[in-house]
Regions:
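Charged, low-complexity C-terminal accessory regions
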Residues: 58-59, 142-145
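Conserved beta-strand in the GNAT
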Residues: 47, 53-62, 68-72
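Active-site rim helix/loop that mediates acceptor-substrate recognition in acyltransferases
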Residues: 22-51
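Short alpha-helical
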Residues: 13-17, 66, 115-116
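Conserved catalytic-core motifs of GNAT/GCN5-like acyltransferases
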Residues: 111, 127-142
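Acyl-donor binding region in acyl/amide transferases
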Residues: 69-125
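Short amphipathic alpha-helix that is part of the acyltransferase structural core
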Residues: 1-33, 132, 145
Length: 145
């Protein structure tokens, strides 16, 4: 069977899926899912799927002026336990970087939230700064425009 990985922006029902994931991941803290109004519009909310199964979501905020972006609230499917989980999450981050480059973003910031996310971002050439779990990356292709 050929595996199909699909990266896309949100469609109806995706926010509710993320809420279920946040509830699972944040159950020990008692934190509520992110309120929809705090997230960007659907075209800046991204999801990656494998064989039709949602694996993870990531959100891109664009600052004004629109050369700086902020990615946040990366959440993954707690039921997806395949060996390629980390690689699919890395692909999600990479694809969101590409979306940011398309619209002229030159630098991305994120708060990684935990060591696994820090490791993933660092492996993708994000520069980790000496504040716990924060990282940024210059999207240098946009410096040449």
């Amino acid at each position: 069977m050929n595996d199909s990985v699909n990266f896309r922006s949100f469609k109806k029902g995706d926010y509710e899926v993320c809420c279920e994931w946040w509830k699972w991941w944040w159950k020990s803290s008692g934190q509520d899912p992110v309120i929809r109004a705090f997230l960007p519009k659907d075209e800046r909310c991204f999801i990656i799927e494998k064989n039709g199964v949602p694996v993870a979501c990531y959100f891109l905020f664009i600052m004004e002026p629109s050369i700086v972006g902020w990615t946040t609230y990366l959440v993954s499917n707690p039921q997806y336990n395949e060996r390629d989980r980390r690689e699919i999450i890395k692909l999600l981050v990479t694809n969101v970087e590409k979306e940011a480059e398309k619209i002229g973003i030159m630098q991305l910031f994120t708060v990684c939230g935990n060591q696994q996310m820090s490791n993933i971002h660092e492996s993708l050439d994000w520069m980790l700064i000496p504040v716990k779990n924060e990282a940024f990356k210059y999207l240098t292709n946009n410096f040449k425009k």
